[in-house]
Amino acid sequence: MRIALCQCNPVMGDLAGNLEKLRRIVRSTAPESPELLVFPELFLQGYPPRDLLENAWFISDGMRSLEQLREISRTRPETAILVGAAFAASGTARKRPTNAAVVVRDGEVIFRQDKSLLPSYDVFDETRYFAPARDVDVWEYGGERIGITICEDIWCSSDLVPEGLYERDPMKQLAEKGVSLLINIAASPFHVDKQRQRVS
């Protein structure tokens, strides 16, 4: 499977600008004919959106951006587009949005995986803004059984997260479901020496 990793820097709160970046990338990757384009965590809204998520208009605007993404995907019907977005709560029981990985192809949302593990330590306060995933699912595409995780979901059993912080392990759940390919989308806040830390 040909996958294009679309590493780019969205601007927090600039939904129109972020969508335009995505549109340009969708167009510019056409000659390579990837079957899947992968964008970062919360790409549509920018990361970290924090208190913007407290505004109903911001969530509504994000869902409208997702509708526009569906239209953009029609220009490349052979390519699936995986993008991070704050997804509006469904029903009345869940008022907080989810931090979601949404897959769109040929005008349709064909898969969605919400983030399972919401960090609330150090600079992170995601439990305040988001509802966690209820489960992890497998996406079958291009002959693969794909597990999609979002940032913290992949770190549950690593030395980077305090032991016992989370009750479930999405990686273990996906392994038990027999995934053949794992995709993790992530974003993290900038700080001084971040690039040096990433390289080392």
What residues fall within each predicted segment?
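Enzyme catalytic cores with a strong preference for nitrogen-chemistry domains
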Residues: 1-200
